[in-house]
Amino acid sequence: STLSAEKIVALQPNLIIDVGNVTPNYIDQAKRTFVQTGVPYLLLDGRLSATPNTLRELGKWLGVEQLTEQQAQYAEETLKSAVDFSAVLQQTAYLARSAEGLQTGQKGSIHTEAMELVGLRNVVEGEHKGLTQVSMEQLLLWNPDIILTQYAEFFQTIKNNPQWSQLSAVKNQRVFFIPNQPFGWLDSPPSLNRLLGVRWLQHLLSNKPMADFAPEVLHFY
């Protein structure tokens, strides 16, 4: 949700923590919020690769370094495992967002970096590396091997849609629903939840029984 500076002040927080983009416009926003509220504003890099350092930095600020060190090590193990896995994966993928499935993240965006980390090649190129709308015609030309989505409405209708059914991913039953409870595992929000999503993707793409993944979910939470 969005809070005004007045509401933030009324809550009397000791610290504002913002994990996400650290581009100049977000830095300026953090500075403005600090000036307006007088509350220290901690802006941390939300990229998946920065997760271990982000956790350690949070530990220092919150006085729980022992806990966040364990979490940071888990993150490092997850990232290394994904990089090793990516060396043997040669498939293209498309992340379908929204009920229509035509919103997605461009290659290198914070929304698709989890699937790209394990070696899936994002079919959507772009300069600003953010969210974008695509057309069905473009998608048919790209013809991804795999489609990933965490939108249940879209997942339920894609197989019966005559346009989408032309895609190889649909024909070959390579359309996968991303778990989204309590948060999306690969996106929405693009945060710590993606560590579990990265491990889930490796399990999925290795064609292992999904029931065998339950212990990892319990360990993560």
Which residues does each predicted region cover?
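Short, composition-biased local secondary-structure segments
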Residues: 1-9, 78-85, 105-107
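Short, conserved, surface-exposed binding loops centered on an aromatic residue
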Residues: 84-87, 104, 114, 137-141, ...
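Histidine- and/or cysteine-centered catalytic micro-motif in compact active-site loops
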Residues: 98-99, 120, 127-128, 144-145, ...
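Alpha-helical, coiled-coil/dimerization segments enriched in small aliphatic residues
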Residues: 104-130
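Active-site/pore-lining binding-face segments in mid-to-C-terminal subdomains
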Residues: 145, 152-199, 203-204
